[in-house]
Amino acid sequence: MRCIVVGLGVQGEKRAICAGKDYVSSVDPVNPKADFKKIQDVPLIAYDAALVCVPDNQKIHIIKYLIKNQKHILIEKPLLTNNLNMIKNIEKMAKQMKVVCYTAYNNRFEPHYIRMKKLITSGKLGKIYSCRMFYGNGTARLVKNSKWRDKDQGVLTDLGSHLLDTTKFWWDDIGEKFKFYSKNCFENRSPDHVIIGSEESSPRIELEMSLVMWRNHFTCDVLAEKGSAHISSLCKWGPTTFVYRKRVLPSGKPIERKITLKKKDPTWVLEYEYFKNICKKSQKTDLSRDYWILKVLQKIQRGK
């Protein structure tokens, strides 16, 4: 499968490396290393799929162009639009043209995320009471210096979309009623530290995201009837640890199993191989999770 990269920034360059021999050319209006300035300049005969890593406000028209010309699409998260129905329209168009439109959330391929999913699905935890996640990095100044990044909902759509996607990955039937617990603009014009949550969902969910965490970090605590499960850090920031604690009744030190990984971030390559495979199988486009994420984000912003 021959791929082009649209948007040759930090993410685009990563995608190009992961595509390996499949990568044929790049598109970027300002990066001098790019082969083309506009996607329309790339000969349609030269590629089968596009890895799209552009600002949110440019995504929809590029997606439509690619679908119209029967090209598979990997679009860097999040897939945002002011019109919620646009997500369904894109899905319908992709199905009609028999192409794959896949939104990239590479954290789905994090080993401990998958391990957590399996544990939750197994039922070993019993009734799950609560899930709290924290995702933070120290990019506040980089965002502040970027005109197109320091605007709108800031960290909520950037890192919050990751956390919502993870929530939906672990609990597919989770509800839509989330709200702000706190929202701060410590250094930036747009929010750079946000906490959202849902007390009406089962389990209850609390998601904290920050651009003012000077050492990049991720934590997760899942508390349940028969035990608990915890993740500390990600492979890219390693080492990353998964802990499963089995409850001892009526009380006492739990039986603990710990798995620590120290390895290079595998998620980008795994995600590209996944994308390549679903294109090969002509899997039908499913943007239902994108629809859910956008609906939740819109409700949070409206305070509903």
Which residue stretches match the model-derived regions?
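N-terminal Rossmann-like dinucleotide-binding module
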Residues: 1-34, 168
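C-terminal helix-rich "cap/oligomerization" subdomain common to oxidoreductases
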Residues: 20, 49-54, 64, 96, ...
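Short acidic low-complexity segments
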Residues: 33-47
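Beta-strand-loop-alpha-helix segment that lines the small-molecule cofactor/substrate pocket
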Residues: 49, 60-108
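Basic phosphate/pyrophosphate-binding loop/patch that engages nucleotide-derived ligands
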Residues: 92-100, 114-129, 224, 228
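Predominantly a Rossmann-like dinucleotide-binding segment in NAD(P)-dependent oxidoreductases
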Residues: 107-180, 184-186
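Contiguous beta-strand/loop segments that form the cofactor/metal-binding neighborhood of enzyme cores
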Residues: 164-238, 267-282
